[in-house]
Amino acid sequence: RLPADERWISLMRKSKVLAKLRSGNAARICSMGHFLPFYVRYAAHFRYDAIWLDLEHRAMTDREVQSLLTLCHLSDIDCMVRPPSTERNRLYRYLEDGAAGFLIPFASDAETARRVVEATKFPPLGNRGLDGVGLDGDFGVQGWRKKNADYTLDANRETFVIAQIETPEAVSKVDEIVAVDGIDGLFVGSGDLGLRLALRENATDGDLDSAIQRVAEASTWHGKAWGAASGSLEAIAKYWRMGARVITWGGDYGLRKVLEDCSVQLDSSLCDESDPV
């Protein structure tokens, strides 16, 4: 919670995602699953608010992650980490190394959500271990020296946790999950959720749409942000009209399409009628 004293100042880098969500605007997020330093600069240049760093399905060393988080700070863009596990110390180490927030996979109940908040927020909201001399605290250069500055308040206010809704159980418990203090929003993992919904008895084609609608309603009721993985711009526009503000589009996997197009262009340029490709 912010102190009543208006002279309180913040020394921590402010989250662009949270600034957008708090003002009711869309947080523009692209994704990255490989160690591509140049991609950070490109994302920041093209006005993305955050990079979704996928460590659930991709492997990186700790030093590679630290390097990318440092580049995000230098480029003034948030890094939203999707972690490979919810192990307590691992989570807050990402924050100390500069992550702006988390996208937590398979947050299927309120207990999971509370456990993550416990690990990533300082008291009284959580039980995160205190260091204060990582990248997030400017390595201690200023964080402990300015009057009315408070690293723990900064960290609680300028970092976020978004829970992924990826199972039918999570949909059935969505109100309990989104109501957890310290959960800033929900994000529907359309692939995993759609897979599981389709395996149920009496499944219908509209089950995923109904689940997304349920997430939207619960998030709106509790005053939290939400979003959903989208496979088309039409879906993004639809979710935006439904109130989605966590918007993801674009990723390093898009390089496949770039190379495909370049290959076709090369074929067109190099072939002639007498020597078809």
Per-range role (PLM):
Residues 21-37, 82-84, 159-172, 225-230:
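Active-site mouth loops of central-metabolism enzymes
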Residues 8-31, 142-157, 213-214, 221:
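N-terminal amphipathic alpha-helix/helix-capping segment at the start of soluble metabolic enzymes
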Residues 68, 110-126, 255-276:
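C-terminal helical cap(s) of enzyme catalytic domains, especially alpha/beta-barrels
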Residues 101-115, 186-197, 245-262:
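Glycine-rich phosphate-binding active-site loops on the catalytic face of alpha/beta enzymes
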Residues 89, 101-180:
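Conserved anion-binding
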